Amino acid sequence: MEPAGLTDAQAPRPDFSPSRPMRKRGVERYNILLDATERLLADSSDEDISLAQIADAAEVPLASVYHFFPNRNAAFVALALRFNEEIYQTSITPLTDPEPQTWQELLHMIHARAAAFQNGRPAALRLFLGAGVSVAVRNADLSGNARIARSRERFFEAYFHIPFIPDFVERLEVAGASMDGIWALSYGRHGHVTEHYRQEATAGAIDYLRRFLPEFLPRKPLTQKALERIFIPIEHMAANPFAR
């Protein structure tokens, strides 16, 4: 799978460290640099990558890299944010063939799809699950997880009649964090998320959510309106991640 490019509207905001590309040509150059960074990270640890190497891999002058990224960590954060968007879009893609009939099955299907995505993108595995994750990259990862948790609640509501559960978004975020921890263990031992550890992580998330969810949730007819509601613009996350 080739990396999806960011549009100008999707480019990271200044508070995420990298300079925001403002024009079409700048956006194109920005995505070229992120593509190069991803290729390098797929084969090398972040400590072994320099801005000069990114420039060489992208076949652009080093000054062009400095225009967007003051240091290599800024490039890694920008790449993490791009991965966040791709992972988010994957996470909200409807499950229609077949549709899940239980909430436990829904989680298995969503998690299997997420694991397949990350296993297909070695740089994403290294950035999010590697031992040397920087604080800035980790914060970017957490911001992405918060957005996924908000949409995950709406995903549940699209497929099932669900009772009111206080702080359900936060419960979903905790379940996701526990899954990430087991995936990181798998990555550390095997270099990818194995199916065994994927199932273990999903089982852990299900056991945790059983503290709050009934074992059985009645299905509801899937509607286009409910599916459209799942998407949350990233701009809505800035002030209050748990706002509905």
Label the predicted regions.
Residues 1-44, 53:
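Basic, helix-initiating cap at the start of DNA-binding domains
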Residues 33-41, 65, 83, 87, ...:
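Short hydrophobic clusters on alpha-helical segments that form packing/core surfaces
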Residues 40, 44-74:
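Helix-turn-helix
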Residues 41, 76-83, 90, 144, ...:
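Alpha-helical DNA-contacting segments of helix-turn-helix folds
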Residues 78, 92-119:
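Hydrophobic alpha-helical connector segments
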Residues 104-106, 119-150:
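Short secondary-structure transition hinges
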Residues 138, 158-205, 212-226:
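Hydrophobic/aromatic-rich alpha-helical bundle segments in the mid-to-C-terminal region
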Residues 215-244:
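C-terminal effector-binding regulatory domain of bacterial HTH transcription factors
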